[in-house]
Amino acid sequence: MLHNTFFICETNQIMNEIEKAKGIILNRNMNDIWSALLIEVKKSNLIIKSTDRNIFFESTISIVSETDFKVLINASNFYDAVKAFNFYKKIKIVFNENNSKLEIMGELNDEKEEYEDHLKEPTFSYEEIENYNYDMVNEDYTFGIEIKQKSFKKVINRIAFSAHLDESKNVLNGVYFSKDEDSKLLLVSTNGHRMSICKTEVIVEEDVNFIVPVKIFNFLKHLMSGEGMVKIKFSDKKFYVEFDNYKIACSLINGNYPDYKSIIPKEQKNKSLVSLGILKDRLARVNLYVDKSRKLVLTFSELQLKLLGEDLITGRKGEFFIKDPNYLYDGADEVMAINISYFVEAISVFETSKIEIQFNSGNVLKLSEPENFNFTHLIMPMSLG
């Protein structure tokens, strides 16, 4: 064994990074290289790479090492091995090139004390490392911006939930990047029954017309600390983000995004202003009475908003009301039905004390913040019958 082919690191730190890296891996066949992590030791850094061949993940942490080397190892096995040593503050990981194994042991404070706890995990061959390797940094990116992490995380929270979760739905499984008439970066997502439209303050000069898989945004929002900046880049084929100690890229979705502008009503005759806290409370209560259809019936009138949930099979029925001063309405008396799950999820991303609800008779429900035109959410109505 080459005794200098090792590194020492904080146990909890590497365990957390491995857990994040293996989170995108879909392949569970331990003998397949696409179930593995690529571990690269470069000077005093450990680079952890993983991919599902659509999303590419890379994180970097500081370590103690003497020699640069690469190891490809099954992600789940490596995580379990490191987790088994979580009662050690630090661990030492040695690469045995002769038998292609990683040896993991607790790092002791007393150098005279011998190691007792240790594990050995098999690794893949050098040939398999070459088959696994990928480079996401040197892509020919043609478009790049920087945005505050806090702002981008907020945009993700408001956009990602509206996209279709079924990857077979192609463009509906993505987030559409465009720009508005003022050249501000605009993001849109829809599953065909609801839609989120979010405008940023980022000015872009280039033409923007990309569809990014929503999976990467659901992954990003759990990684971002909310501090510092995010670098965002696009090429003809890839979307790339870089922040903190992470670099993440994914392949773009090919296809034409639906004409979302044609769905947005130009003018709504009926407008209401509702206390967000009271609305959340009433929705939580009426949700107990909504059946599997998820149908919520809203009755708008001058004096009150009625929320009706009913199970036609069991006969259970719940009616809850919101009145002045928590409800103001300008419009004709109207009754409409919407999916309560969509409604609850949508209002959870609003941060103001009141929410505007606008609609035309029998048409799409538009949710927005008073005097804020940067975020709009649309919900298609359900049949009342």
From Swiss-Prot:
Keywords, sorted A to Z: Cytoplasm, DNA replication, DNA-binding, DNA-directed DNA polymerase, Nucleotidyltransferase, Transferase
Originating gene: dnaN
Keyword Transmembrane: no
UniProt subunit comment: Forms a ring-shaped head-to-tail homodimer around DNA which binds and tethers DNA polymerases and other proteins to the DNA. The DNA replisome complex has a single clamp-loading complex (3 tau and 1 each of delta, delta', psi and chi subunits) which binds 3 Pol III cores (1 core on the leading strand and 2 on the lagging strand) each with a beta sliding clamp dimer. Additional proteins in the replisome are other copies of gamma, psi and chi, Ssb, DNA helicase and RNA primase.
One of the record's GO molecular function terms: DNA-directed DNA polymerase activity
GO biological process: DNA strand elongation involved in DNA replication
Compartments, record wording: Cytoplasm
GO CC terms: cytoplasm; DNA polymerase III complex
Organism of provenance: Borreliella burgdorferi (strain ATCC 35210 / DSM 4680 / CIP 102532 / B31) (Borrelia burgdorferi)
Taxonomic superkingdom: Bacteria
Role: Confers DNA tethering and processivity to DNA polymerases and other proteins. Acts as a clamp, forming a ring around DNA (a reaction catalyzed by the clamp-loading complex) which diffuses in an ATP-independent manner freely and bidirectionally along dsDNA. Initially characterized for its ability to contact the catalytic subunit of DNA polymerase III (Pol III), a complex, multichain enzyme responsible for most of the replicative synthesis in bacteria; Pol III exhibits 3'-5' exonuclease proofreading activity.
Family (UniProt): Belongs to the beta sliding clamp family.
Signal peptide feature range: none
Protein name: Beta sliding clamp
InterPro entries reported for this sequence: DNA_clamp_sf (IPR046938), DNA_polIII_beta (IPR001001), DNA_polIII_beta_C (IPR022635), DNA_polIII_beta_cen (IPR022637), DNA_polIII_beta_N (IPR022634)
Database matches in PANTHER family: BETA SLIDING CLAMP, DNA POLYMERASE III SUBUNIT BETA
